[in-house]
Amino acid sequence: DALNRQRLLDAQTFIRDELAQEGIPFAEIEQRLVPVPGDENEVDVFINVTEGQRVTVAQVQFSGNESGGDDDLRGAMGIKREGFWWFRGGSFNEIDYDSDLESNIPALYRSQGFLDAEVVSDTVVVDPTTGKARLEITLQEGQQYRLNSFSVSGNSEFEEEEFSSLFTSGEGGVLSSLGLGGGESTNVEGNIFDVEAFNGAISQALEWYRNEGYLYAEINPVITRLESEDGSSPMVDAAWEVQEGPLALINRVSIVGNDFTHEWVIRNQLTVIPGDVYSQDRLIRSYQSVSSLGFFETPMPFPDIEPTESGDVDITFEVAE
């Protein structure tokens, strides 16, 4: 093949990533191009890898975490300290560590009302003799926000009272930590605003819409900050802006790949019928029923949903015998 230096760099990146997954994040990789004797247009490629010490996490230290202890933060991380038992190896994985810094730790803080929390610096200190590492993470929490109000706009299929079942404390809704729908929501101090739960409940609300045929529904979360004027905790007004979109009907249901099984055997398992309003729940149950026949390779690919020009959908079930 023609020499491609980008492919050589990609090979080094692949090797480095694979070693990092095994707890060897600081490998040295050297590349050499050696001319082939007697052929000036060819070279042999040699990649020399010096793995270095396998790194395990011995300590994880935090600073700047004024609102809570280290244990909660460690529990939110994918990186774990080495333990006494064999299944707590504590290997250092750079990809997981980056995910902890950029996602897992900030998500924990956002669930506790700290909307601006961030990791401002980190250091990995490795003992070159033992390979044991100490992770030093510095945090800036920012202010803790509480909930002032919640509202929904653009909704006609579901009333705002119906949405409240998602976050009424007494009903164990997805947003129960917000305290909405009950007396606690009118508390002067407000409830701590769990933005992770607030955003997560959107998936449940969209599932409602998809089960009623609103396949194209969208919900835009809006968080408006209300700064404190008297030294009390700052608050937020939280809202969902709903765009329900058109109602989608099922135009056509096709089955492909059934070379031996009669089509009616499969269609008897389907609860999605042409002319019906689209329902995500019925589509999933149909998929599960066909899979459970035992005639086809598993896992089956999920049915393909193809929108038509009119906004309706064609559904295709693909099976392999």
Please tell me what each predicted stretch does.
Residues 1-321:
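Periplasmic polypeptide-binding modules associated with outer-membrane biogenesis and secretion
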